[in-house]
Amino acid sequence: MYKRQVIRCWHSTDVAACPGSGKTTVLLAKLKLLADKMPLEKGAGICVLSHTNVAVDEIKNRLSDYADRLLNYPNYIGTIQSFIDRFVTMPYLRNISGQNVQVVDSLTYAQHMLSKMQHEAKYKALDYVTRSNFETGGQFSDRINHTQALHIRGDGALCIGKQKKPLAGVGKASAGQYKELLAELLKDEGIIRYQDAYVYASVAIDELPAEYTDLFSSRFQYVFIDEYQDCNNLQRQAIDVIFDPQKCAVFKIGDSDQAIYNSAEDTTPDWMPQPDFLPIVTSCRFNQEIANVICKLKKSEKNIVTLAGATGVKPV
C-alpha cells in the first residue's frame, strides 16, 4: 500500500522510508513509468540525484534497458555535488574569472601559491610571515607542506594548521595578501582547491538570479533526490533554491534514521520530512520481533511493519 502511494504520486513531496523498505526499487519504478511517457511536454527532462558515484552507477545499471530514454539529454542522473559543480559553481567561476576553472589538489595549489609568494613583490609581507613561522615552528618538513596548511579563520585572521594563535590578524597586510593571492590564482591561472569549491558554491547559490533558477524548473519536470537525509546544509540550500516545488515535482527521498555524519563538527540538522510526507514503513530486511526493538531507537513515531515471518530467535 505504502509503495503504491509513492509510485502513484506525481506532485512534490517528501518520502520517508525505513531500513529495507525498497525505496530504490520504488524510485526505479517511477523512473520506468516516466520513460514510457517520454518525450515529456515542452522537451522537459528528469533529474535524479544521489550522494555517491556507487549509488548513481547502481541506478544507471538497473535502468540499462531504458538507457536511450533516461540516460541522455535532457535528463540528468548524477551525484548532488557534481550537479552543483556543473550547473552552479563552475558557471559562476567562469563568469568572474573569464575562463574555464580547474579544481586541483592542495599540493599543486600550494606549489603555485609558494611560487608567487617568493617571486612577486606584492606578496612580500605574506612571504616574510609564513617563512618566519616555518623556520621557527619546526612542525613542517618543507614550505610546500607549510603553505598547504595556511587558511583564513572565521574572524579573518591568517592561521596555520590547528594552531590557535594566528600568524596575522584580520587587519594585517599578510592576511590581506593571502586573500589577494587566492583571487589572483583564480583569475589569472584558473585554479581553485577542492576545499574552495564549497565556499564558491555557497556564494554562487546566494547570487543565482531568479531567471536562472526558473530554467531548472522548466528543464526538469521531475526531480528525485535519493538519500536526502545525507545532504549537508549547502546541498539542501542549493536544492531549495534551484528547484521550485510549485513549478516542478520535487521528491526528497530518505530515511532520517540512516543519516551519515561526516564529522563531529558537522552542524547540519537532522532531516525532518514535511508534515504531509509519504511514508514507506514496510521492510523486508528483518523480522517483526527485531523491527519492534529497532522502533524504540527511531526518531520518528512511525512503526516498522515487516513482510518477513516470525523469527525463531528473539532479539536480546
Please provide the spans of the model-predicted regions:
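Conserved RecA-like ASCE P-loop NTPase motor core of nucleic-acid helicases/translocases
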Residues: 42-56, 75-77, 253, 280-282, ...
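P-loop NTPase Walker
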Residues: 3-95
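Conserved catalytic network of the ASCE P-loop NTPase/AAA+ motor domain
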Residues: 38-41, 69, 214-216, 242-246, ...
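Walker B catalytic acidic pair
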Residues: 227
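Accessory N-terminal region flanking or inserted into the helicase ATPase core
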Residues: 3-19, 25-26, 45-47, 122-224, ...
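DNA-processing P-loop NTPase/helicase core
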Residues: 18, 86, 91-129
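Alpha-helical scaffold elements adjacent to nucleotide-binding pockets in ATP/GTP-utilizing enzyme cores
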Residues: 30, 58-63, 83-87, 200, ...
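Conserved RecA-like helicase ATPase core segment
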Residues: 237-311
